[in-house]
């Protein structure tokens, strides 16, 4: 990292609200860059040094780091923080004219994902594992990388490129309400849903960033009306959905550091789901700042 502002990549959804508050109210000095296609794009940008820090989905980071370690390559980044403690509800969506009516109809179907290695990709394997559809000889689905959320919606409708896709519930709900999509199920992540990754865990600016994010989280909790105004005013969420989401989400009290046990648990589930093998490098190959080491 240079002496310049931190370059922070984030996903432009409601979960980004404390980051915006950290900048607006507490003077976090950062150049922030939105990545609407998700965590797979964040990991690619960490690797090519176009960002210093990324706030993204736990499964996307752990899957990518595990695959990097399996190739015996040095990871370009590691995990340095925990952003959201609560699990993520992934809604399972099909096109509005689809004959699919339940999760059980999805075996061997075409799954649309934002990109290989993204959360939407990884969670399709977690779904397959929970349903007992995993076979060593073949993939449980035909995986179709489509890009951003709009491309996924188009892909199950007019584009007819995929049979279903998975995306965060509240981001998707508007399209159930307007009839564009049909909801056939849901799956929760079996781990805290959002983490923070960085290229250089020794950079002192990360400590300042964590302090400012903690303040942003506290502001978010204490000023829920402003939080709803930000979410509905800058993103495509209704007031009703924003308020409903506020009741379900739990941001970390202190974002600095990662619970090694959480990463171990995530690795074990991703191994069981066929996303990672036993050469994934374990926690040491993924975590740069653990909660036990972060200090006070």
Q: What name fits each language-model region?
A:
Residues 1-3, 296:
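Eukaryotic N-terminal targeting leaders
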Residues 3-144, 163-169, 183-184, 188:
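Short, glycine-/small- and polar/acidic-enriched structural segments
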Residues 20, 61-62, 93, 125, ...:
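Predominant activation on well-ordered alpha-helical scaffold segments within soluble catalytic domains
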Residues 45, 64, 109, 127-131, ...:
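Structured segments of extracytoplasmic/periplasmic soluble domains
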Residues 59, 146-233:
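Pocket-lining segment of extracytoplasmic ligand-binding domains
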Residues 97-101, 200, 204, 255:
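Proline/Glycine/Serine-rich low-complexity intrinsically disordered segments
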Residues 203-277:
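Secondary-structure end/capping motifs
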Residues 271-296:
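Conserved C-terminal helix/tail region of periplasmic/extracytoplasmic solute-binding proteins
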């Amino acid at each position: 990292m240079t002496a310049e502002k931190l370059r922070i990549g984030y996903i432009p959804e409601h979960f980004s609200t404390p980051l915006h508050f950290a900048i607006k109210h507490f003077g976090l000095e950062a150049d922030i860059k939105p990545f609407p296609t998700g965590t797979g794009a964040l990991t690619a940008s960490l690797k090519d040094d176009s960002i210093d820090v990324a706030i993204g989905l736990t499964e996307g980071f752990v899957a990518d780091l595990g695959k990097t370690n399996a190739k015996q390559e040095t990871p370009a980044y590691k995990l340095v923080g925990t952003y959201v403690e609560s699990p993520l509800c992934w809604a399972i969506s099909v096109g509005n004219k689809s004959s699919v009516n339940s999760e059980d109809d999805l075996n061997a179907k075409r799954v649309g994902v934002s990109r290989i290695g993204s959360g939407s990709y990884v969670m399709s394997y977690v779904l397959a594992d929970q349903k007992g559809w995993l076979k060593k000889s073949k993939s449980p689905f035909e995986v179709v990388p489509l890009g951003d959320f709009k491309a996924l919606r188009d892909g199950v409708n007019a584009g007819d490129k995929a049979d279903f896709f998975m995306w965060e519930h509240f981001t998707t709900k508007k399209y159930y309400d307007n009839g564009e999509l049909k909801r056939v199920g849901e799956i929760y992540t079996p781990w805290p849903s959002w983490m923070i990754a960085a290229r250089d865990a020794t950079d002192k600016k990360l400590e300042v960033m964590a302090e400012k994010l903690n303040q942003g989280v506290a502001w978010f909790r204490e000023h829920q009306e402003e939080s709803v105004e930000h979410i509905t005013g800058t993103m495509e969420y209704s007031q009703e959905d924003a308020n409903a989401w506020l009741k379900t989400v739990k941001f970390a009290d202190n974002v600095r550091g990662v619970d090694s046990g959480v990463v171990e648990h995530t690795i074990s589930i991703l191994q069981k789901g066929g996303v990672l093998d036993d050469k994934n490098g374990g926690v040491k190959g993924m975590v740069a700042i653990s909660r036990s080491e972060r200090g006070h």
